[in-house]
Amino acid sequence: MGKPLKSVFKKEHRDDVSNPSANPVFSSVAEMFLSRRRFLQMGAVAGAAASFPFLLKPENALAAVSQPSALSKAVSLGFTSIPVSTDDTVRVPEGYIARPFYRWGDATGIKGNMPEFKFDASNTADEQAAQAGMHHDGMAWFSLPQGEENPGHGLLAMNHEYIDNGMLFTDGTASWNLDKARKGQNAMGVSIIEVKKSGSDWEVVRPSGFARRITVNTPMQLTGPARQQTLMKTAADPQGERVLGTMQNCANGYTPWGTYLTCEENWSDIFVKKGERNALEKRYGISDSDESYRWSEVDDRFNVDKTPNEPNRFGWVVEIDPYNPDSTPRKHTALGRFKHEGAAVTLAADKRVVTYMGDDQKFEYIYKFVSDNKYNPADRDANLQLLTAGTLYVARFNDDGSGEWLPLVFGQNGLDKSKGFESQGDLLVKTRLAADAVGATKMDRPEWIAVDPHNSGSVYCTLTNNSDRGKEGKAPVDAANPRANNAFGHIMHWHEEGGDPAALRFKWDILVLAGRTDTADEKAKGSMKGAEFGSPDGLSFDHQGVLWIQ
């Protein structure tokens, strides 16, 4: 008989705390800087759907803090908001329809390999590698033909974040073996599917020369300073240049040159070490048990006692070329190693590439990467190298509303051998420890980041929640987070100096506190008029400059 059902659900290690540093927490910084009157009071808000309920037009947000009359009104999108409900059903506004499109087990569309889904869960591991994975998450659109704007035909790149073992097999987790682990590994990763509009409906093109599945066992290349570092070498890869697979792919990003960025988030859930954990393993949340995935029981890659450096090969941003199904995905170590939620890409004033990233765990940090070289729209081959070299920064939020980006560079700010760093590559494997050392500001689970396409240097970040707020030994309640056991979260905004994303200084403020509208309790009340929401996560601008919040 399999393990109890409760043991096969996803374990939320993002809810653990792995940061023991004495760095300032954002709540205490915000308390010194903000007062209740400074929160933006948003007016009319349109509700889009149960999963994307709020739309804001936050132009010139910082100016609006001191000049409330300057706030732009929310844009009406022409449909009626969906009321709050606990019904177990998908609901959309009147005049819209929703239907399943690409379900777990649907054929991806790979030529000559399109297995049908078997509802008794008897599909093999090899069949799963040609089918949609489980638990879809971040995704991005790439028009076809390449280089043209075509809203009716394109490629959809989609993450498959995690799995439920209890649903993958006919007998659940009984008689656990390597083949079962392989099927689970093939149900994670990324799908590339070709989609096309047909009349008023959409269809997945099958077969397609673009169709592809990327899984936990797909060969990948390592790039950047951590390539060939001692901490990246294993018996299977003694040079530290190649790695198998990507997993726990949460949010995403996309580049101006037409590639997909998939982000490895809760990868530490997979690894188990029974022996004593070192400081690096503790800082990244490596555990001594795993009742959810159980790969470490049958696959030594995920048994840290046997393969100690394998965890170091995860926690990166992976670049995939959706237009070239024969290309090798690349893990870009220059962008740092942590629990990447997403990667928001924009261009600096001088055309260098800037990528904003959040580390989605309690009291972790916000980062940005600035490339060494510049984007050239006429040279895609050169652009494909832009994320291999540059400078990684981590944010510090000061109590006067200013902020600065602190470089994580070997030999600067005390980041040297005396602090346990051997080189730039070694430092990037230990990104969290480097951010601790320079005094970055602890945040409340940074999730998605969105760059305003109509206001250069204006950036927004969801801080989803923090149930440890106010607990003994943790950050206290404060003006910016006025509730213990903060279940609602907030959204923050910063504007880079001079409107340049590559700037090293910025001004910050709070866009909105999430919460309820039916209470006068300041510990639970949101600051947005006319609507309520909690635990903001996904964040994206549309072509009108409307900010969509999940």
Describe each PLM feature range.
Residues 32, 38-64:
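N-terminal export signals
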Residues 125-141, 238-251, 439-448, 525-540:
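Signature of short aromatic-glycine-proline-rich micro-motifs recurring in repeat-based ectodomains
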Residues 161-184, 268-308, 371-374, 465-485:
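Short, conserved, GDST-rich strand-edge loop motifs in beta-rich repeat architectures
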Residues 188-195, 286, 313-322, 369-370, ...:
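Beta-propeller blade signature
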